[in-house]
């Protein structure tokens, strides 16, 4: 009886080994409770030369201050927390307490965006604020998206880009304190404002975020 038991155990081990090989060849990961949690690296924000002094926000290519982003896969949206890199805050790590999981090595398609309002199932349309004279309203007019990107198992990177356009105005030959700057003649498509009061970033420079368009003029 002992010899029979040994032979049966060996046969079971052989079958398990064959099953593991078949699973690996098919591209599936070793079995776990749900798989391996997906952790993303967020990149793509451009630290423009016109970055606003004193601000730390996506508008200036910086993830510092961003708490979370929306991440959509297969029609489902989950919240991922943002941890900016201490060495390079233009990149960040995205993790979640309720993550998506890798169940195999196949590529996945992901859309992500910021800012995110609970209940959104797709990235919102670009809609900027009419009065961006306050820093929070300038920064709050931004929209960054990683749209329908292919993410690989070995390099789960999301490259975000700005959906807004940035207009910067530098004043010369004027008396300080007497200037009033206003962007006018803007497209109102998507319920965007026809006029925008820009943010005074100092050094005779004003900046604003607008929906992508040709700027007709300002005063």
Regions inferred by a protein language model and the residue ranges of each:
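Sec-type signal peptide cleavage vicinity
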Residues: 2-11, 18-219
């Amino acid at each position: 009886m002992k010899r029979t038991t040994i032979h049966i155990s060996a046969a079971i081990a052989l079958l398990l080994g064959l099953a593991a090989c078949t699973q690996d060849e098919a591209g599936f990961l070793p079995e776990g409770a749900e798989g391996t949690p997906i952790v993303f690296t967020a990149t793509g924000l451009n630290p423009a030369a016109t970055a606003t002094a004193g601000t730390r926000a996506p508008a200036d290519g910086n993830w510092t201050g961003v708490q979370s982003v929306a991440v959509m896969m297969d029609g489902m949206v989950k919240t991922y927390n943002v941890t900016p890199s201490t060495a390079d805050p233009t990149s960040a790590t995205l993790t979640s307490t309720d993550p998506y999981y890798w169940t195999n090595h196949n590529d996945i398609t992901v859309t992500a965006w910021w800012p995110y309002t609970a209940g959104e199932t797709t990235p919102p349309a670009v809609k900027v604020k009419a009065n961006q004279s306050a820093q929070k309203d300038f920064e709050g007019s931004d929209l960054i998206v990683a749209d329908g990107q292919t993410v690989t198992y070995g390099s789960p990177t999301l490259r975000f880009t700005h959906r807004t356009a940035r207009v910067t105005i530098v004043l010369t030959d004027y008396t300080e304190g007497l200037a009033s700057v206003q962007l006018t003649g803007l497209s109102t498509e998507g319920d965007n404002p026809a006029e925008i009061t820009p943010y005074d970033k100092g050094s005779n420079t004003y900046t604003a975020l607008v929906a992508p368009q040709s700027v007709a003029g300002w005063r």
